[in-house]
């Protein structure tokens, strides 16, 4: 989260996106690696005109365990962001769909050319999530929509996540919603999205900013 994108730590861009939704009044950073370094950089969030709270996992808890550990005492809908995703999505629209559908969970899906490198997510005609297929083979591909690593969740569903053990949001928590026939809906987003988890993608982000494919404060369109 603190690798630089030009002159700013990557996490700045995610916080900028969250700040576009006025009702998001607190950012909780779930940390495990170098927590003090991250806290030194971002402080209490006042310099960014937001409120930041830090939660440090005692041991690695997995993607679902980390969400429960950070948000177990929350009572309102929670927006969850993977720490390596850069996007220009309209989060307010995602939250609006979540509320309109009275969903227990909403997942953002994004189309990619080759879902075999990720894991596809199947939905029905009503936009309900029906199945996850991790790193499918070519003959298993039924859609090119993948998990974009952005969710809106209801905290009272966290009770199914075990405490103090590593648990996966993709392999365990989400399938439990499907098994219980909870209202679990998808928001399809076809705009700019990238996972910067590889050196190649990290380099690509800089090119995208230079070429104007990704535009956000403090950047203007640098290709103009």
Language-model-detected regions and their locations in the chain:
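N-terminal glycine-rich phosphate-binding loop and ensuing alpha1 helix
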Residues: 1-38
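A structural signal for short hydrophobic beta-strand segments in well-ordered beta-sheet cores
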Residues: 2, 121-123, 186
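Active-site phosphate/pyrophosphate- and oxyanion-stabilizing loops and adjacent acidic/basic residues
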Residues: 16, 68, 175
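Residues at the starts of beta-strands that form the adenosine-phosphate
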Residues: 25-27, 51, 104, 183
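Short beta-strand segments
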Residues: 28-30, 82, 107-109, 152, ...
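Conserved beta-loop-beta/alpha segment of the NTase-like Rossmann-fold superfamily
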Residues: 38-125
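Catalytic-core segments of class I nucleotidyltransferases/pyrophosphorylases
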Residues: 78-79, 86, 92-99, 113-115, ...
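Structural signal for interior beta-strand "rungs" in well-ordered beta-sheet cores
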Residues: 223-224
């Amino acid at each position: 989260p603190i690798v630089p994108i030009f002159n700013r730590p990557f996490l700045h861009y995610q916080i900028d996106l969250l700040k576009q939704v006025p009702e998001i009044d607190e950012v909780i950073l779930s940390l495990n690696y170098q927590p003090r370094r991250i806290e030194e950089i971002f402080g209490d969030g006042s310099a960014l005109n937001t409120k930041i709270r830090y939660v440090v996992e005692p041991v690695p808890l997995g993607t679902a365990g980390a969400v429960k550990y950070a948000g177990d005492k929350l009572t309102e809908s929670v927006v969850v962001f993977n720490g390596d995703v850069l996007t220009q999505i309209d989060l307010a629209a995602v939250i609006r769909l979540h509320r309109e559908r009275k969903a227990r969970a909403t997942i953002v899906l994004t189309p990619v050319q080759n879902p075999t490198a990720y894991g596809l997510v199947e939905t029905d005609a009503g936009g309900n999530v029906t199945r996850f297929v991790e790193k499918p083979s070519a003959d298993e591909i039924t859609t090119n929509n993948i998990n974009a690593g952005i969710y809106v969740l209801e905290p009272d569903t966290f009770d199914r996540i075990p405490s103090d053990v590593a648990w996966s949001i993709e392999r365990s928590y989400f399938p439990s919603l499907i098994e219980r026939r909870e209202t679990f809906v998808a928001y399809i987003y076809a705009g700019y999205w990238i996972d910067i988890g590889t050196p190649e993608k990290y380099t690509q982000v800089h090119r995208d900013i230079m070429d104007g494919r990704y535009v956000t404060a403090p950047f203007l369109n640098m290709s103009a």
